[in-house]
Amino acid sequence: MANRYDDNSIQILEGLEAVRKRPGMYIGSTDTRGLHHLIWEIVDNSIDEALNGYGKKIQITLEADGSVTVQDEGRGMPIGQHASGVNTLQVIFTVLHAGGKFSSEGGYKTAGGLHGVGASVVNALSEWLTVEVAHDGELVRMEFADGGKKIGKLEHLGKTNRTGSTVRFKPDPRIFSTTEYKYDVVCERAREEAFLLSGIAMVVSDKRNKKNETEKYLYEDGLTAFLEYLHEDRNVLMNPVKFSGEANGIQVEAAFQYTDDYQENTYSFVNLVRTGDGGTHEAGFKGAFTKAINDYARKYGLLKAKDKNLEGGDVREGLTTILSVSVPEGLLQFEGQTKSKLGTPQAKTAVEAVVSEKLSFWLEENRNQSDTLVRKMLKASLARIAARKARDEIRKGKRVGKGEKVLSGKLAPAQTKDARVKELFLVEGDSAGGSAKQGRDSHYQAILPLRGKVLNTEKCTLADIEKNEELNTLIYTLGAGVGPDFDYKESNYGKVIIMTDADDDGSHIQILLLTFFYRYMRPLLEQGMVYIALPPLYKVTKGKTTEYVYSDQELDALRRKLGKVEIQRYKGLGEMNATQLWETTMDPSQRTLIKVGISDGVKAERRVTVLMGDKAELRRKWIEDNVSFTLEDTFDLEG
């Protein structure tokens, strides 16, 4: 019988019910990323207070019971009667799109919390939430439970001389796949906010263990400190340059610094909200920066009349930029609820005006350094032309039969043509590759053995990559281009799974491949298309029963349970036959995969720098401290 679709099929979701029904629409996901997003929905409100001159400290506490407390020194949320007839505090926490940031009369000149859904969404997705507010001499409290239902009335706690808001909430385990917060993730984000809020302290405390850890982040020259933090383990070519200005009522603050790397990195913010997908402000910065450089180069003869202008990629090779703009509420436009891309047209012209004036002045005042930078850019231009030819060969296979030759005898392709379901296993070694080819489901699983040495691409150009057989093969196999031309939508595979031995060499191959993906196919990571397979460490046998174990802790528990057992330690994938490899590592119903993503671009950038940069001692120490080749500690750009 077909499902009926009539008048009774139409549902109206009341209040916060819509948030619980479709949480991804409001916080992006219900995994660890969405979980941490709850904190920042509340913190953003506290930051908006600080941004407008109210308060010098924001405290975030991970409580022992799994809840989170956010406390600020702002004016305190309004606690009187709202025009709707309900207490204003209740309106803030139970009504979507209720807030003081929708008009210039709302109490905020600039604010990141534009949509007015932050507090109510956190309430909707919490097991319980309490809010205490010190406002106009009064201290009050209101409590909610079970997805935002108010408990009792507004409680008056007495008089107070302080001001501010304290929100404590516990995420609902019925909504989230995990409710355990990562202290280091919260600290990284708090540090980032402190860089942008010069003079404002961000404090993070963890009361969940005996250490009772606390970190305080306070910077007087935030953007310069931000660059120094990012480049702590890099070779810089100059001191940080910082400038600020205002145009069209929009405040612009920027800092930049060159390193000896080939990649560019831009970290942009609007009203302290990270815009990971860029937007009009980034476009304005990049356009004005490139124009100022070209104007300078032509003025002083570094570019001749017959020469073409330097392109943006030439100018920004090795450039790290921090761009922070403050946009008045009346002009603020984000594309989407997650606020990852700015859409305000006026921001582009404002940033262009400030950057054009300030950068042109700096170039003139620092002629020797400016000339050195332009000569570096001219070399980058020549390398770009060579790399473009290499990319054309990679993408189009200009040499006759080159694509077939590259893949010949290596790739065991999948039968299906549906890229969405296809999986590409990158397997360490020929022997394991052979077992994987025999054990796989050939309908949708393809195997590409890695035979030679994978290149460390942290210090390479695209021309270097084109000469490396293993990476060249991988690029052809994925079929989506490389570098600036890469388009994840063109990928021949929906999943790319790295499958290596659980030892030092296997870990190193993982890191080399992840570095390549991060530098030259980053959208694969951003879209969650890259995974690490976890093969078992042990085969445990007792009688006719066999179990596979993935960590030493799991082995100890199994030995206590079963008593005397026979244990086989797998030193490599090649020690498993085709059936065992399928059952333990490749079968979707049995295997364990770790998705490698980028939840924190700053942290990912620093981690890749440490692991793959030219400072071997830092790399050795990080691997010793962080990698034990178990389920818990596999390399992950998110972690």
Each model region followed by its residue ranges:
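Conserved short strand/loop->alpha-helix "switch" segment adjacent to the catalytic nucleotide/phosphoryl-transfer site
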Residues: K21-W40, K109
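Short conserved segment of the HATPase_c
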Residues: I79-A98
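GHKL-family ATPase ATP-binding module
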Residues: M1-S9, L16, W40, D48-A50, ...
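Conserved ATPase-coupling elements of RecA-like P-loop NTPase cores
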Residues: N52-Y54, I79-H82, K437, I509
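C-terminal interaction appendages of subunits in large macromolecular complexes
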Residues: L382-G403, D418-E423, G434, Q438-R440, ...
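Residues immediately C-terminal
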Residues: D48-E49, G76-M77, D504-D505
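Flexible beta-alpha connector loops of hexameric P-loop NTPases
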Residues: Y26-R33, P78-S84, F176, G276-D277, ...
